[in-house]
């Protein structure tokens, strides 16, 4: 472990060391750590990127109110996006990665949006490319269809697995009481 940890503080079991993977890199933590505390102890500060300008985001709190440290846990059909690193318990073999960044959270090509921020007014993505004359459906909406895909891809959060769910459940709640 690194020197980022205080020796005799915290409610962790220092006798049980757990290995985990963050962005394809091996790290170690202790039983009782959250993913966020283990990353901070290993001197990992950037865990995600903001959705619009792709600015670096780190751990800012220690509970469920955390909005900057959303990560993807697992892989394949067991991939679980938008997990708060502060509430994810560390376990041996945990595979986690940052979200909303390409190729990684430390170097993100989407960060160029930060330099173009003066051209991106708040809410620009709602009606900017809707059509001509302004906001008239049917005329000029083809350009919106093109830009909508690009904007949604750039502004997305974690990506859910497209594979079938491998788990089985006791029963499925596949009905609704009220449909509007």
Regions of interest found by a model, annotated:
Residues 1-180:
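Residues forming the flavin
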């Amino acid at each position: 472990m690194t020197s980022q940890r205080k020796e005799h503080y915290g409610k962790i079991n220092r006798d049980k060391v757990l290995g985990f993977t963050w962005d394809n890199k091996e790290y170690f933590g202790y039983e009782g750590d959250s993913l966020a505390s283990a990353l901070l102890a290993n001197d990992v500060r950037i865990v995600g990127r903001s959705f619009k300008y792709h600015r670096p985001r780190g751990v800012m709190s220690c509970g469920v109110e955390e909005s900057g440290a959303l990560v993807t846990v697992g892989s394949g059909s067991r991939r679980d996006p938008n997990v708060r690193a502060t509430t994810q318990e560390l376990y041996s073999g945990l595979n986690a990665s940052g979200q909303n960044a390409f190729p990684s959270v430390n170097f993100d090509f989407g960060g160029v949006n930060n330099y173009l921020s003066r051209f991106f007014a708040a809410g620009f993505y709602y009606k900017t490319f809707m059509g001509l004359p302004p906001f008239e459906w049917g005329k000029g909406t083809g350009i919106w269809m093109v830009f909508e895909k690009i904007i949604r891809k750039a502004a997305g959060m974690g990506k859910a697995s497209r594979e079938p769910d491998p788990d089985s459940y006791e029963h499925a709640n596949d009905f609704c009481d009220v449909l509007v």
